[in-house]
Amino acid sequence: MTSLPLPIAFPPRRTRRDLSPAMRAMVLVAGGGLSAMAAVALGRAALGLAPAAPAVREVAVALHLATVLPALPLGLYLLLAHKGGPHHRLLGKVWVMLMLVAALSALGIRHLNHGQFSAIHLFVPLTVIGLWRAVASARSGWIATHRTTMIALYLGGLIGAGAFAFAPARIMGLWLFG
C-alpha cells in the first residue's frame, strides 16, 4: 500500500511589503471611520439636510474637498491591498497627485482665520515633503522607507488633518453634525 504524504499547511507568511495586523487594524478603523463620516456628511449636504456652507463656493475649498474626499478611501485601499504590482503603482500615482493638489489648495483656505494661516497649515509642507520622500524611496527601492512614509502621510496628513475638518466651525463638521 502506498500513500502520499500530506503537505503541512503553514499559515501564510507576511511579505515584507505588507502591514502588520495591528497597523492594518489601525488604518482600517481610522480610515474607514473618517471615510464613513465624510460619506454621511456629503450625503446630508447633497440631500439638503445640512446647513448651507457658503465657503464651498470658493475655488480653493471646492478643489480641496474634491481631492481629499477621494484620497481617503483610495489611500485606505492602497494600504490594505496587495502592494508592488502595476495596479498599486498606478493607483499610488493617482493618490500622490490627489494629495499634492489637496495640500497646495489648502494654502488658499484662510477664511476661518481672518486671512491668516493657522496651525493646520503646518500639514502642507509636511505633506509635500512626505510625498516627495515616499516617491523617491519607492523609485530607489527603499520599500521600508516608502511604506513608513506612506503610513505616516495617511494617518497624519490625511486622517490627522481630516479630524480637524469635522470640528463644529468647519464645513465637514457643519454638514455632519448640522
Summary of predicted features, one role per range:
Residues 2-178:
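Alpha-helical membrane insertion/targeting regions
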